[in-house]
Amino acid sequence: MTTTIRSGRLSGWESFCNWVTSTNNRIYVGWFGVLMVPTLLAAAICFTIAFIAAPPVDIDGIREPVAGSFLYGNNIISGAVVPSSNAIGLHFYPIWEAASVDEWLYNGGPYQLVVFHFLIGICCWLGRQWELSYRLGMRPWICVAYSAPLSAAFAVFLIYPVGQGSFSDGMPLGISGTFNFMLVFQAEHNILMHPFHMIGVAGMFGGSLFSAMHGSLVTSSLIRETTETESQNYGYKFGQEEETYNIVAAHGYFGRLIFQYASFNNSRSLHFFLAAWPVICIWITSLGISTMAFNLNGFNFNQSVLDAQGRVVPTWADVLNRSNLGMEVMHERNAHNFPLDLAAAESTPVALIAPAIG
């Protein structure tokens, strides 16, 4: 009989595995983190370089490049990483697919590099949240809550461009680019009249309201552990078992302010509601973006309201329709991209004499 005694020294691979999965590290790495770190670094580095120095991009595919970087006259507000060209469409466009680096830059290759690495990175961040919760014996609801902004990012950076047929329709990576995306989205899909967007607004504003209400109620019903001359914050010790506020007092106040059943008498159900309300609403909004990506748009009221004599009764819907058309015209300023809902109508003369050119 042969007995094998294993050496106490670990191999390099075993040491690496122990380090990756250790919860004693100052910052937990995890197996998802092994992929998250390089992808997010690649996205951040490419974004920074492109924001500073990228040349203009032929976003519409019509040889009219749009500049988005600092070196081409933009500032922190107007700057953006411009989406890849409409000539590329939905083709995967890594740097080795272009004939040269100049061509790759001209067609907006950095946008795809940033977006794809970013999406992989934030998926790994979600997985890392679950992994750390699992190793600490916690429930997985933190990563479930994070899935709400994750779904929103996938909706605007991947699902919407796929539905529209080109990554040039993706959201530009910049402040003014984000607002431009919002205006164009409203013009083409009437998102303000989509019920899923309305639910998202209720989630955002409602979540902010509920958060402020909860914080103010807790702060107003703290159990005093300090003197008048000390900060109330010193009355709490990290890890203490005792409640730091009186939930009975908060429940009684809010129940009398509105009505009894508007107030939670269970701290766990209260905090679940505070997490679930905005998360579910953002999920629904992301679903709305994903459906509008395939042109299942918001409600439209293109037919004006008429009175008994056939006269148009002006409504807010008419104002909204005109603003949508105006935004669409400004966005698609070239004749061959002219909005179909305007081009299909009878031409209306706006000048009696054609202006002389030159």
From Swiss-Prot:
Alphabetically ordered keywords of this record: Calcium, Chlorophyll, Chromophore, Electron transport, Herbicide resistance, Iron, Magnesium, Manganese, Membrane, Metal-binding, Oxidoreductase, Photosynthesis, Photosystem II, Thylakoid, Transmembrane, Transmembrane helix, Transport
Localization per Swiss-Prot or TrEMBL: Cellular thylakoid membrane
Transmembrane intervals: 28-45, 117-132, 141-155, 196-217, 273-287
Propeptide: 344-358
Binding site for chlorophyll a ChlzD1: 117
Other facts noted in the record for this chain: Cyanobacteria usually contain more than 2 copies of the psbA gene.
Role noted for this protein: Photosystem II (PSII) is a light-driven water:plastoquinone oxidoreductase that uses light energy to abstract electrons from H(2)O, generating O(2) and a proton gradient subsequently used for ATP formation. It consists of a core antenna complex that captures photons, and an electron transfer chain that converts photonic excitation into a charge separation. The D1/D2 (PsbA/PsbD) reaction center heterodimer binds P680, the primary electron donor of PSII as well as several subsequent electron acceptors.
Protein's UniProt name: Photosystem II protein D1
UniProt organism field: Prochlorococcus marinus (strain MIT 9313)
Gene that this sequence comes from: psbA1
